[in-house]
Amino acid sequence: MSSRFERLAAHTVFEGAIVDVIEGEFRHEDGETVTRQWVAHPGSVAIVAHDGERLWLVRQPREATGDFDLLELPAGKLDEAGETVLECARRELAEEIGKAAANWEHLITYKTSAGFTDEVCHIYLATGLRDKPGYAIADERITIEARQLADLGAVLGEVTDAKTLIGLLLLRQRLDKKAA
């Protein structure tokens, strides 16, 4: 059973460098009032980048999950004032893999984990790649990994990151449609 609700109040209980924790009070249409906490996040982008032969990914440590070299799509936060989602995707592609793309297509926008955060992730397909040296961010420790597009199935078997799985499954769906 779904229920409409209104937010009565909300305040920040923790302010961090990357996220904030918000506590809010809500009244549902049946009159019940509930208190909820959630992680406030500025949103993110991820880029499925390929040149027709190679698929461009990154490996980086993710301390929160204990991963020393998590295989991921190039991605980043929407944390630059005034920057559009597409501008953020272009910036992240340059920063993380040193590429620019002639062609951009929005694939999906989804809620990353609606039970505890308001983060939405926007995934783009980037093709027509060319070199564009970006600038490395000192604490990211990124390793660029180019994989054969023909090995997409094997790559999917290695991936445990949600945004990367979503993006690569959407890519595989597109490639399968083209092949049919």
Question: What are the functions of these language-model segments?
Answer:
Residues 2-5, 32, 69, 116-117, ...:
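Nudix hydrolase/Nudix homology domain
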Residues 28, 49-51, 59, 125-128:
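Residue-level signal for short segments within beta-strands and strand-turn junctions
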Residues 5, 9-46, 51:
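Acidic, metal-coordinating catalytic segment for phosphate/diphosphate chemistry
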Residues 21-23, 57, 123-125, 144-146:
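Conserved hydrophobic/aromatic beta-strand scaffold that supports enzyme active sites
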Residues 42, 62, 72, 94-131:
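Active-site segment of metal-dependent pyrophosphate-handling enzymes
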Residues 2, 45-91, 108, 133, ...:
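Conserved Nudix-box catalytic region and its N-terminal flanking loop in Nudix hydrolases
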Residues 15, 20, 43, 117-120, ...:
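A generic structural signal for well-ordered coil/turn residues at beta-strand boundaries
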